[in-house]
Amino acid sequence: MGKIIGIDLGTTNSCVAVLDGGKARVLENAEGDRTTPSIIAYTDDETIVGSPAKRQAVTNPTNTFFAIKRLIGRRFKDDEVQRDVNIMPFKIIAADNGDAWVESRGNKMAPPQVSAEILKKMKKTAEDFLGEEVTEAVITVPAYFNDSQRQATKDAGRIAGLDVKRIINEPTAAALAYGIDKKQGDNIVAVYDLGGGTFDISIIEIDSNDGDQTFEVLATNGDTHLGGEDFDNRLINYLADEFKKEQGLDLRKDPLAMQRLKEAAEKAKIELSSTNHTEVNLPYITADATGPKHLVIKITRAKLESLVEDLILRTLEPLKVALADADLSVTDINEVILVGGQTRMPKVQEAVTNFFGKEPRKDVNPDEAVAVGAAIQAGVLSGDVKDVLLLDVTPLSLGIETMGSVMTKLIEKNTTIPTKAQQVFSTADDNQSAVTIHVLQGERKQASANKSLGQFNLDGIEPAQRGQPQIEVMFDIDADGILHVSATDKKTGKKQNITIKASSGLSEEEVAQMVRDAEAHADEDKKFEELVQSRNQADGLVHATKKQVEEAGDALPSEDKEKIQAAMDAVDTAIKGNDKEAIEKATQNLIEASAKLMEIAQAKSQAQGGDNADAGKQANAAADDVVDAEFEEVKDDKK
């Protein structure tokens, strides 16, 4: 069985790790980096992922996608999505089923389809390191992801050609990375995870006893639309407003200018974590009738902190809720772990320190801990890591809509998973032959205020008075936190397994089609790579042949020169096209046309070899006249 890899599919950056010699190892991508920007760009003839996609974003803003994780498993009409519609340079659209999709060059794409490109790069990175095909993975998600978002993440894995063996919560993965080497004792750890697009807090008990380790999540909370991207946007808006005050021009109407502004704002934010002031300097940011305009604005750390103060405060309320749900106080927390790049901001660290009354640990890499934890969980599943038990929870309550549009909960939030729950329901009217079961996720009493996961009808109920039929509804949450529902008519004993047909999400057919498309693109990518290789070989041969023709000079007959030149011209013409066979044929013709040239080069080489042999004889003769002498080493005491 091949290795199961661990992938942190992040909003801003992604990371892949694998167990190597019993230890989790973070892998470097093709660019030599341990993290990969979660950016995907579509051009006329290829899909670009990671740093290369980020570099070309300024010239291709409408077809370069970032922070796609904020759209995964979401409805277009969601408030969070509508906020992004107004600020993203790319097009966010409503799919036929109401989901939030994106559009590039007229192609409509689901977020899992776009995210799959990042997962494919992570898969390739692992395959290059391991030297074998990778087909299985553990993928992390924010702890506060709902059922739709978790299912969409699994779909992304499938489209990328991965069998997702487990979906694991990011804070839990970070706790695994932190606690795996802690051999003794019982620790209660708070994992504060503020990433690029999401925020989570998990309270986790780590019990290490005689080599056995249990990681039990006591409570989790968070906000799936709060992260570093929001911090960036505050700074972007400030810079755009300041420029408008100075120049009277609104940069928000210029996608190219906004892309440059985004890069500069992100860079300035990072710099202000280690310095008290910086300058954003963007020459030729835009132009009007009076000429080009330049943006030069100084920013202090204090200014940035004032712009994002409310965002930092927003992270504190979930901390209070998680502690209350775990029935703990801040004094019960032994260690605080910071995860996610945004936690490098000093003001964030200060807020966390003040809340818990203790300094967070500095020995956990906030960018890599989640991927390391995913690799450890992969090791647990494959049997390579033993004596580790992970007990995670469902972040939100699950239930169904009952009379009066009330949500009746079957499984409470922070219940350890996997778990099952059942409850008996009945009909609301006499002789009712079918019931509609509306499955919900959330904490509100009013059904419509919660997340709808879908609904199904149970038909064939025997006619009876209202309240007499007994229908047992079973909720089953698997280890990935994904819900399965079944229903049983207790009178007949007939059980029916129900697959929720959610109003949102990708159907089985859509996922299968996307998998086929991805496989087709894989073939295209391979052919493109082979074409480029043929072009490079042909180009190299032309360059070498030209050099040899010059070196041969008059020794090469003019007839052969003409023949070689014609063959080189044919190669140059073939290289400009996309026909690999034509390039290889032209290359072979050039090799054959250069036969005389090869003979001249070989003869010249042999002649030089003869000269070298004569020179060698002279050198040996001179060596016979050399007299060996004793010598004494003189040491310089002044050194």
Swiss-Prot record:
<dbReference type="InterPro" id="IPR029048">
    <property type="entry name" value="HSP70_C_sf"/>
</dbReference>
<keyword id="KW-0067">ATP-binding</keyword>
<comment type="similarity">
    <text>Belongs to the heat shock protein 70 family.</text>
</comment>
<keyword id="KW-0346">Stress response</keyword>
<feature type="compositionally biased region" description="Low complexity">
    <location>
        <begin position="606"/>
        <end position="624"/>
    </location>
</feature>
<dbReference type="InterPro" id="IPR043129">
    <property type="entry name" value="ATPase_NBD"/>
</dbReference>
<feature type="modified residue" description="Phosphothreonine; by autocatalysis">
    <location>
        <position position="198"/>
    </location>
</feature>
<comment type="function">
    <text>Acts as a chaperone.</text>
</comment>
<feature type="region of interest" description="Disordered">
    <location>
        <begin position="604"/>
        <end position="639"/>
    </location>
</feature>
<dbReference type="InterPro" id="IPR018181">
    <property type="entry name" value="Heat_shock_70_CS"/>
</dbReference>
<keyword id="KW-0547">Nucleotide-binding</keyword>
<dbReference type="GO" id="GO:0140662">
    <property type="term" value="F:ATP-dependent protein folding chaperone"/>
</dbReference>
<dbReference type="InterPro" id="IPR012725">
    <property type="entry name" value="Chaperone_DnaK"/>
</dbReference>
<keyword id="KW-0597">Phosphoprotein</keyword>
<dbReference type="GO" id="GO:0051082">
    <property type="term" value="F:unfolded protein binding"/>
</dbReference>
<dbReference type="InterPro" id="IPR029047">
    <property type="entry name" value="HSP70_peptide-bd_sf"/>
</dbReference>
<dbReference type="InterPro" id="IPR013126">
    <property type="entry name" value="Hsp_70_fam"/>
</dbReference>
<feature type="compositionally biased region" description="Acidic residues">
    <location>
        <begin position="625"/>
        <end position="639"/>
    </location>
</feature>
<dbReference type="Pfam" id="PF00012">
    <property type="entry name" value="HSP70"/>
</dbReference>
<keyword id="KW-0143">Chaperone</keyword>
<protein>
    <recommendedName>
        <fullName>Chaperone protein DnaK</fullName>
    </recommendedName>
</protein>
<dbReference type="GO" id="GO:0005524">
    <property type="term" value="F:ATP binding"/>
</dbReference>
